[in-house]
């Protein structure tokens, strides 16, 4: 362990770090491992919109949350606190941190908010504490927090396999997205237990996605049957494009070639929906924030 990782760090002012949302442009389940985890294939698309994680380094080693970005979630259960403590434990870092999150990404919507926040803490504190861990090491730590964390650590759009941790960077065309949060949350484990879920899809290749033949999400038919609010959103979005589900839901989206087209579609939606527009990113703004501190 590099000695700098074992030293305390001086107190700093607050710094702001982006935690972008993501979309799953398709998602299929191809099998199940011996330990019960499902094997999947998906494409992660990073967005130019998301949460902001504020960090302040504190000497003495204490890690604490400031504010309550997730009402009802105990501090010890908060992914950002768990991420900071995991990094501290893994490296022997003696510095601490205060963490505050400006939440914009809906919790439990499949947009990756919790995972992205955790990844941002890992990447940012690695820089602020002067630890010097490589992306591979940070991604390995992130996997202990959740299968989606590594893609946010690496910061690139990716084809994903395994439980979502086997990542192959891919280039995606520019696009804008109309996003809708139906406002319902179904725990992912309950969806994986559903008898309606297709678990034996034929493994696909990146070329299949590139050809446009992969658009479906295995959780979509399950959620649309179970949740009237999700079905209502799909019906509303079908009037302006082809709606899709992200993650295990319940967030929905429609892809457009330009932001102007997405905003025009947004204006056509009925009132009462929580809807907004975001653009796809070629890479995570978190990487830009990290690199700016290294200059």
UniProtKB/Swiss-Prot annotation:
Could you tell me the keywords of this UniProt record? Answer: ATP-binding, Isoprene biosynthesis, Kinase, Nucleotide-binding, Transferase
Catalysis performed (reactions): 4-CDP-2-C-methyl-D-erythritol + ATP = 4-CDP-2-C-methyl-D-erythritol 2-phosphate + ADP + H(+)
- Is NAD among the key words of this record? no
Q: Where is the active site?
A: 22, 148
GO molecular function list = 4-(cytidine 5'-diphospho)-2-C-methyl-D-erythritol kinase activity; ATP binding
Which InterPro entries does this chain map to? GHMP_kinase_C_dom (IPR013750), GHMP_kinase_C_sf (IPR036554), GHMP_kinase_N_dom (IPR006204), IspE (IPR004424), Ribosomal_Su5_D2-typ_SF (IPR020568), Ribsml_uS5_D2-typ_fold_subgr (IPR014721)
The residue ranges crossing the membrane are: none
Q: Which residues bind ATP?
A: 106-116
Establish whether keyword Isomerase is in the entry.
Answer: no
The enzyme's E.C. designation: 2.7.1.148
Q: Which pathway does the UniProt entry assign to this protein?
A: Isoprenoid biosynthesis; isopentenyl diphosphate biosynthesis via DXP pathway; isopentenyl diphosphate from 1-deoxy-D-xylulose 5-phosphate: step 3/6
* Gene Ontology BP, a term: isopentenyl diphosphate biosynthetic process, methylerythritol 4-phosphate pathway
Family named by the database record: Belongs to the GHMP kinase family. IspE subfamily.
Q: What does this protein do?
A: Catalyzes the phosphorylation of the position 2 hydroxy group of 4-diphosphocytidyl-2C-methyl-D-erythritol.
Quote the protein name from its UniProt record.
Answer: 4-diphosphocytidyl-2-C-methyl-D-erythritol kinase
Query: Per the UniProt entry, what species is this protein from, by scientific name?
Result: Xanthomonas axonopodis pv. citri (strain 306)
């Amino acid at each position: 362990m590099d000695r700098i990782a074992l030293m305390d760090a001086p107190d700093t002012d607050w710094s702001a770090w982006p935690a972008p949302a993501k979309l799953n442009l398709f998602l299929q389940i191809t099998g199940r491992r011996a330990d019960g985890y499902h094997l999947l294939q998906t494409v992660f698309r990073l967005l130019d919109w998301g949460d902001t994680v504020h960090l302040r380094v504190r000497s003495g080693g204490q890690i604490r949350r400031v504010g309550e970005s997730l009402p009802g979630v105990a501090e010890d259960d908060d992914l950002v606190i768990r991420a900071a403590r995991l990094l501290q434990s893994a490296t022997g870092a003696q510095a601490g941190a205060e963490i505050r999150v400006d939440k914009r990404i809906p919790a439990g919507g499949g947009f990756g908010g919790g995972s992205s926040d955790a990844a941002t803490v890992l990447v940012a504190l690695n820089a602020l504490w002067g630890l010097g861990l490589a992306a591979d090491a940070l991604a390995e730590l992130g996997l202990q927090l959740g299968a989606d964390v590594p893609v946010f650590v690496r910061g690139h759009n990716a084809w994903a396999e395994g439980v979502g941790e086997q990542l192959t960077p891919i280039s995606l065309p520019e696009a804008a997205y109309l996003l809708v949060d139906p406002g319902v949350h179904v725990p992912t484990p309950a969806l994986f237990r559903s008898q309606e879920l297709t678990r034996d899809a034929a493994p696909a290749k990146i070329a299949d996605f590139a050809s446009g033949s992969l658009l479906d999400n295995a959780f979509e038919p399950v959620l649309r049957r179970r949740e009237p609010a999700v079905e209502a959103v799909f019906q509303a979005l079908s009037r302006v494009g082809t709606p899709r589900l992200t993650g295990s839901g319940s967030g929905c989206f429609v892809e457009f070639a330009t932001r102007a087209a997405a905003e025009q579609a947004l204006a056509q939606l009925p009132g009462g929906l929580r809807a907004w527009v975001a653009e796809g990113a070629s890479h995570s703004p978190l990487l830009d924030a990290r690199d700016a501190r290294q200059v």
